[in-house]
Amino acid sequence: IDVLISEDVIDTRIRELAAQIDADYAGKSVTLLCTLKGAVFFACELAKRITIPVFMEFIQTSSYVGTKSTGKVSMKLDVDDSAVKDKNIIIIEDVIDTGKTLSVVKEMMQARNPASLKVCSLLDKHECRTVPFEGDYIGFTIGDDFIVGYGLDVDQKYRNLPYIGIVR
């Protein structure tokens, strides 16, 4: 595994994203809707650095088996409508890849009438899009390498690496 983005660089970028969220939602609160399991590390670090009131909710979707996307999105864990309705929701994702999963999740959440709805992803593999989708807060734009660490895994391994690495 080769280091792609170091722990220090990730930390600096998360602080920048938190500052942007603070500015965008000054005087308000936000609900971070964390996608399990991959985005947990990112969501926790981001939440610690946001200074406005933060609430956290969790959802779990699945579209991968091993290193391959199945192309189908399934919701394994969802939240109550009351956790979304009239709230400032920021969906927290580890990586935007094809855009399919987040398109489905965003559509589902929008139907629950949030006050606002945005997406924050640590990583963006923009060249991999198969549907039009743009995140609102992006940590890093990267290529199509298969990556692990900082919450990202391959068959549940390497999630705990403190950096983002490329599997060779």
Language model: regions and residue ranges:
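PRPP-associated nucleotide enzymes
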Residues: 1-168
